[in-house]
Amino acid sequence: MRGCKGARGVGCGHLGADVPAGRGWARAAPAGARLDRARAIIGVSACTIIELAALELLVSSGVLVVCVGGGGIPVVLDQHQRLHGIEAVIDKDLSAALLATQLDADALLMLTDVPNVEAGWGTPQARPLTDVTADELRMLKFAPGSMAPKIEAACRFIEATGGIAAIGALADAPALLRGDRGTRITAPTSSPPGA
């Protein structure tokens, strides 16, 4: 499955004490943070949702499930098929797309603090996007660690399912689903799901 191989460095794991010397840890800190209390950790894409059966049961019972916040807890299987936690960060947007795909959802909503995705964000040429295809979005540039992961997640979901994705403000969730607000992302009319 795409996204299961390799890792990229992202974020910081904040420790309660100074980073021990000699462990080979890379150090990184956001602006204003103490470098001796942070270290770089890898960011990975989830390969599977371990609790999928439980989530399917809840959804089929009519329960509104809010999950994969923060991306989930990164674990690996050892040679005895036991799960162990690893020091990594799982991308929450890609995890949401994976879960929506595995649940065979019709739509993926990514709720954020802005009303729309903007082409050219932060420039005088910035313009809100309302209806756009995954292919059109892939031709644009977005800020890494901000809108780019949401765009990638939306595109992966759409390419896998043929469903729709929407990105916009939390308060606009029902309108996002109807296509009345936010950025609605669809598959190109010539692309079948899974293509």
What does each model-identified segment do?
Residues 1-195:
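C-terminal catalytic "cap/lid" subdomain
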